[in-house]
Amino acid sequence: MSVTIVSKRYASALFDIVLASSAVDETEKELNEIKKVLKADQELNDFLVHPKITADKKKHLIAEAFKGVSTHVLHTMYLLIDRGRTNIFSEMTSEFVKLANRTKQIDDAIVYSVKPLSGAEIQSLSEVFAKKAGVTSLRVENVIDKDLIGGVKIRIGNRIYDGSVSGKLSRIERQLAGENR
């Protein structure tokens, strides 16, 4: 079974549990924090996937390292350890965030620009493109991309809105190339 399918199943099960107890936001924060730690600490990842280290030792380390997390998150980690699936934690977290966002009518957007955008510019883009995306609000991440020349390019899910100068030049180039055939 593919990692994506398995990740979605674990994320969905955890989401259903925390939705019933109204702890979606807290769980999302905890999962993202653990994801950051696992991404930053390769030794911890190696420990969790090492076949000669017992599940009990792995669980003990997780319990000590993440003392403040909720029992739902901790037990999900234990389940992943028992089933030898700690490698899907990052993708499971991403799937959980997608479920939480869908419930809250929020989507994530990446805004590429030549220079950092001000808070007002980000807010304005968020309001305009939230309507286009069919959600109430967008969480915007601003990424600097000097190749754009000017303007912005916005990615929301699998949709891209390209209002950059380089994008416009590319479209003009394709049109001219099409006319020369």
Swiss-Prot record:
Pfam families: OSCP. Its main location: membrane. GO terms for cellular component: plasma membrane; proton-transporting ATP synthase complex. It is a peripheral membrane protein. One of its GO terms (molecular function) is proton-transporting ATP synthase activity, rotational mechanism. Keywords: ATP synthesis, Cell membrane, CF(1), Hydrogen ion transport, Ion transport, Membrane, Transport. Gene3D superfamilies: N-terminal domain of the delta subunit of the F1F0-ATP synthase (1.10.520.20). The keyword Ribonucleoprotein does not apply. PROSITE patterns: ATPASE_DELTA (PS00389). It is found in: Cell membrane. F-type ATPases have 2 components, F(1) - the catalytic core - and F(0) - the membrane proton channel. F(1) has five subunits: alpha(3), beta(3), gamma(1), delta(1), epsilon(1). F(0) has three main subunits: a(1), b(2) and c(10-14). The alpha and beta chains form an alternating ring which encloses part of the gamma chain. F(1) is attached to F(0) by a central stalk formed by the gamma and epsilon chains, while a peripheral stalk is formed by the delta and b chains. HAMAP family: ATP_synth_delta_bact. Belongs to the ATPase delta chain family. F(1)F(0) ATP synthase produces ATP from ADP in the presence of a proton or sodium gradient. F-type ATPases consist of two structural domains, F(1) containing the extramembraneous catalytic core and F(0) containing the membrane proton channel, linked together by a central stalk and a peripheral stalk. During catalysis, ATP synthesis in the catalytic domain of F(1) is coupled via a rotary mechanism of the central stalk subunits to proton translocation. This protein is part of the stalk that links CF(0) to CF(1). It either transmits conformational changes from CF(0) to CF(1) or is implicated in proton conduction. This is ATP synthase subunit delta. It comes from Bacillus pumilus (strain SAFR-032).
